[in-house]
UniProtKB/Swiss-Prot annotation:
It catalyses: (S)-2,3,4,5-tetrahydrodipicolinate + NAD(+) + H2O = (2S,4S)-4-hydroxy-2,3,4,5-tetrahydrodipicolinate + NADH + H(+); (S)-2,3,4,5-tetrahydrodipicolinate + NADP(+) + H2O = (2S,4S)-4-hydroxy-2,3,4,5-tetrahydrodipicolinate + NADPH + H(+). Its main location: cytoplasm. Belongs to the DapB family. This is 4-hydroxy-tetrahydrodipicolinate reductase. GO terms for molecular function: 4-hydroxy-tetrahydrodipicolinate reductase; NAD binding; NADP binding; oxidoreductase activity, acting on CH or CH2 groups, NAD or NADP as acceptor. SUPFAM superfamilies: Glyceraldehyde-3-phosphate dehydrogenase-like, C-terminal domain (SSF55347), NAD(P)-binding Rossmann-fold domains (SSF51735). It comes from Lactiplantibacillus plantarum (strain ATCC BAA-793 / NCIMB 8826 / WCFS1). InterPro entries: DapB_C (IPR022663), DapB_N (IPR000846), DapB_N_CS (IPR022664), DHDPR_bac (IPR023940), NAD(P)-bd_dom_sf (IPR036291). Pfam families: DapB_C, DapB_N. (S)-2,3,4,5-tetrahydrodipicolinate binds at residues 152, 161-162. Keywords: Amino-acid biosynthesis, Cytoplasm, Diaminopimelate biosynthesis, Lysine biosynthesis, NAD, NADP, Oxidoreductase. NADP(+) binds at residue 36.
Amino acid sequence: MVKVIVAGYKGRMGSTAAQMVIDNPDFELVGVYDARSEEQNLGEDDRFKGQNVPAFHDLDQIKTDATVWIDFTIPTAVYENAKFALNHGISPVIGTTGMTDEQVAELQKLAKDKQVGGLIAPNFGISAVLLMQFAQQAAKYFPDVEIIEMHHDDKIDSPSGTAISTAKKIAEVRQPKEQGNPDATETLPGARGAEYEGMRIHAVRLPGLVAHEEVMFGGPGEGLTIRQDSFDRISFMTGVKVAVEKVNQYHELFVGLEHLL
């Protein structure tokens, strides 16, 4: 039985993760945390009536025997949350994006020092993991590429962690290249999107969307588009479940769900 605490349970991803833990007979939800809440018990939330699980709204309050910390909070909170988990011997499974490379490196060092496993996943959807792998393969042959990520309009950070991770994987194998006409101008600033290693990333925010990404490659006389769609947040729970099951087997902090698959 894996004992789990879920951080960010008031949000849509966090509440979905909490329900996944409750529904899984191999997991036990032993606590929830959300700095926005003043509830003392998860059962006070209308979505979780009948559940008797301690709820915390301050890290200093947390007393738990959890071995896994699922985090779907916000970019400004996730780093401190992950440090708290690692310092208490709890393996973090982090779906919150927005941390800097320096923060990730510090967490990886802390995990190694504490001999605690952990995972930071820009995306827990299996289709998104496959998209990144396929895009990396295609980039060996198509150095001209643009990334378009599309999310719901409540998403705070842009571009998405998945788009950045996709760009990093492409950059590992792509021939260095500055795309487009070197004399090109923008009538409206930002029209060509954000620049990363010579390629462009575009972020779309609209109501009705959940999480979607297209990677478009172009070559002489041909093109290739790889697309992934998450239509419901439940699609991410397969990856979260895998992470919860496996993360305690390791003694380091991985970045990317593919390391556990």
